[in-house]
């Protein structure tokens, strides 16, 4: 059981390093796009409210 818990914490530390990784140099031109990508779902949420306001929240 302790082995399983330690394996979980070891693997979770690897995931945090992956999220902070940089793109390879060949893809450096896509850095601005990659920076904006996590915000895109928020735009869809806001679009839903704008759409409902346009149809008077039926």
Curated annotation (Swiss-Prot):
Membrane-related topology note: Single-pass membrane protein
Keyword check for Thylakoid: yes
Residues spanning the membrane: 29-49
UniProt xrefs under InterPro entries: PSII_PsbK (IPR003687), PSII_PsbK_sf (IPR037270)
UniProt-annotated location(s): Plastid, Chloroplast thylakoid membrane
Pro-peptide region(s): 1-21
Pfam family, one: PsbK
Any one Gene Ontology BP term: photosynthesis
Top-level taxonomic group: Eukaryota
Alphabetically ordered keywords of this record: Chloroplast, Membrane, Photosynthesis, Photosystem II, Plastid, Reaction center, Thylakoid, Transmembrane, Transmembrane helix
Gene Ontology CC terms: chloroplast thylakoid membrane; photosystem II reaction center
Keyword Transmembrane helix: yes
Role noted for this protein: One of the components of the core complex of photosystem II (PSII). PSII is a light-driven water:plastoquinone oxidoreductase that uses light energy to abstract electrons from H(2)O, generating O(2) and a proton gradient subsequently used for ATP formation. It consists of a core antenna complex that captures photons, and an electron transfer chain that converts photonic excitation into a charge separation.
Family: Belongs to the PsbK family.
Subunit structure: PSII is composed of 1 copy each of membrane proteins PsbA, PsbB, PsbC, PsbD, PsbE, PsbF, PsbH, PsbI, PsbJ, PsbK, PsbL, PsbM, PsbT, PsbX, PsbY, PsbZ, Psb30/Ycf12, at least 3 peripheral proteins of the oxygen-evolving complex and a large number of cofactors. It forms dimeric complexes.
Protein name: Photosystem II reaction center protein K
């Amino acid at each position: 059981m302790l082995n399983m818990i330690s394996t979980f914490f070891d693997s979770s530390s690897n995931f945090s390093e992956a999220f902070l990784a940089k793109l390879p140099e060949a893809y450096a031109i896509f850095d601005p796009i990659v920076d904006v990508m996590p915000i895109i779902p928020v735009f869809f949420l806001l679009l839903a409210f704008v759409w409902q306001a346009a149809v008077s929240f039926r």
